[in-house]
Amino acid sequence: MQKLVIHGGSKLHGEISISGAKNAALPVLCASLLTAEPFAIQNIPHLRDVTTMLALLEQIGVRILTNEPGTTELSAANITNPTASYDMVKTMRAAILVLGPLLARTGQAHISLPGGCAIGMRPVDQHIKGLQAMGAEINIEQGYILAQVGRLSGARIAMDVVTVTGTENLMMAATLASGTTILENAAREPEVIDLANCLIGMGAKIEGAGNDIIIIEGVDRLHGGSHVVMPDRIETGTFLTAVAACGGDVTLIGTRADTLDVVLGKLAEAGADIDIGGDWIRLCMQQRPQPVSLRTAPYPAFPTDMQAQFMALNSIAGGTSIMTETIFENRFMHVQELTRLNADIQVEGNTAIVHGIPQLDGASVMATDLRASACLIIAGLIAQGETIVDRIYHLDRGYEQIEQKLAQVGAHIKRIN
Ligand SMILES: CC(=O)N[C@H]1[C@@H](OP(=O)(O)OP(=O)(O)OC[C@H]2O[C@@H](n3ccc(=O)[nH]c3=O)[C@H](O)[C@@H]2O)O[C@H](CO)[C@@H](O)[C@@H]1O
Ligand SMILES: C=C(OP(=O)(O)O)C(=O)O
C-alpha cells in the first residue's frame, strides 16, 4: 500500500496550478446522460473518482469518444443499462447523481442506496422525495432505488435540508420534465452554478442557480456541446492553508477567489497577507498563525470540506480555537491522528476545542477520508521530523498530483510503496 513520507519544517515558495474541481466534474459527467449528442468536457481533473465515474457511465452504455488529459468527450446515444450497482456507489457517493438524469432521459433507473460512509450518514431521502413529487414511482428493494416514470412533470419542491447532490440531481431531472420545476431551499454552492451553466449550454432553461430558489422550465431534449469545469476551490483552499501553516509565499494559478470568500477571510484572520487577481491568489505568511474559530455550514458559509485542513493550522496557532462541524456527524476522525503528532485537541459533540502548541512532532498516522488526508499532510509539513501518512488511497479520490504540487513549492514529501 502506498504511503507519503513528509519531512516537515520547510517554508513554501513558488507557484501551483489548480486543477478542475472534483465536485463539479462529477455532476457534469452525469449531465452527459441527458443528451443523445456528443458532449465534451474540459478541465477534468485526473482523479480516481473521475475514473470510477467514467467506468460507471460506460456500464450504463455511454461511449467514451475521447479521453485525453484535460478533455473527455462522451456519447450517451444508447443508454442500455440504467443501473448503478452498490460496488460503484459505495466507492464514490457521487454515483447517486446518475439517478435524476437516467430517470429523465429513459424513464427508469435502478440505483444502489449509498448508505453511510466514514464521515457520516449520507441519506438521499430528499432526492427521492423530489423525484416522487415530479411523478416518479419509486420503490426501495434490497438496498436499491427502483424508479420509473413515463415523463417527469415539473413540481414545486421544498427541500427540508440544504443538499448539494440533491439539488444537482433534481435540477438535472427537471431539465427534461414537462412544465416548470421550482426548487426551494436549494444549495447555493459554486458547483451547483457550474452544473447549471453546463446544462444551460446544452439548451436547458434554468434561472436562479446560486440562489436558494432555482426555476427550471423543462424542454423536450438537450443537445450536445462542451463545458469547461470550474477550478477546484477545495484544492485551492487546501494549498492556501498549507502555506498559512508552513509560512512562505505562494501564488495559486488558474483558480477563482470569488468562490472562497469565507475561507480567505479566515486565512487573513490567521495572519496571512492575501492578494487576488482575475485567476490567481497569492498568500504570504510571515508569522505564527493566530487561532481561527469557525462553524461549517452550507455555502456561502465555511465549507465542511475545509474543516480538517484548518484544524491542522489551528493546532500550531498562538491560542485556542473552537471548531464546529454541522454538516457531517463523524468528520473529526483526523483529531485522533493529529494527537499522535502531539496536537492538543478535545472533542465535545460536534465541536473541537483546539489549543495551539508551538510545534507538532512527526509520527506515523493513518488517513481516514479525503479531507482528513489533506489535514494530515499539512500537519506533516509543519511537524518537526518525519511523518508517514498511510492509507493515502483516499487522497487520490480528490487531489491531482498533490505531492508533486507541494514538492514544487519546496515541501519535502514523497510517495513510497
Ligand atoms: C451542504 C454541504 O455542505 N454539502 C456538502 C456535502 O455534499 P453532499 O451533496 O455529499 O451532501 P449533501 O449536501 O447532500 O448533505 C448535506 C446534509 O444534508 C443531509 N441530507 C442530504 C441529502 C438528503 O437527501 N437528506 C439529508 O438529510 C446530509 O446528511 C448532510 O447532513 O458533502 C460534500 C463532500 O464533503 C461537500 O462538498 C458539500 O459541501
Ligand atoms: C467527502 C467528499 O467527497 P464525497 O462526497 O464524494 O465523499 C469531499 O469532496 O470532501
Curated annotation (Swiss-Prot):
Keywords: Cell cycle, Cell division, Cell shape, Cell wall biogenesis/degradation, Cytoplasm, Peptidoglycan synthesis, Pyruvate, Transferase. InterPro entries: Enolpyruvate_Tfrase_dom (IPR001986), Enolpyruvate_Tfrase_sf (IPR036968), MurA_subfamily (IPR050068), RNA3'P_cycl/enolpyr_Trfase_a/b (IPR013792), UDP_GlcNAc_COvinyl_MurA (IPR005750). Pathway: Cell wall biogenesis; peptidoglycan biosynthesis. One of its GO terms (molecular function) is UDP-N-acetylglucosamine 1-carboxyvinyltransferase activity. SUPFAM superfamilies: EPT/RTPC-like. The active site is at residue 117. UDP-N-acetyl-alpha-D-glucosamine binds at residues 93, 122-126, 305, 327. It catalyses: phosphoenolpyruvate + UDP-N-acetyl-alpha-D-glucosamine = UDP-N-acetyl-3-O-(1-carboxyvinyl)-alpha-D-glucosamine + phosphate. GO terms for cellular component: cytoplasm. Pfam families: EPSP_synthase. One of its GO terms (biological process) is regulation of cell shape. It is found in: Cytoplasm. CDD domains: UdpNAET. The modification 2-(S-cysteinyl)pyruvic acid O-phosphothioketal is found at residue 117. Gene3D superfamilies: Enolpyruvate transferase domain. It comes from the Bacteria. Its main location: cytoplasm. Its EC number is 2.5.1.7. Belongs to the EPSP synthase family. MurA subfamily. NCBIfam families: murA (TIGR01072), PRK09369.1 (NF006873). Cell wall formation. Adds enolpyruvyl to UDP-N-acetylglucosamine. This is UDP-N-acetylglucosamine 1-carboxyvinyltransferase. It comes from Nitrosomonas eutropha (strain DSM 101675 / C91 / Nm57).
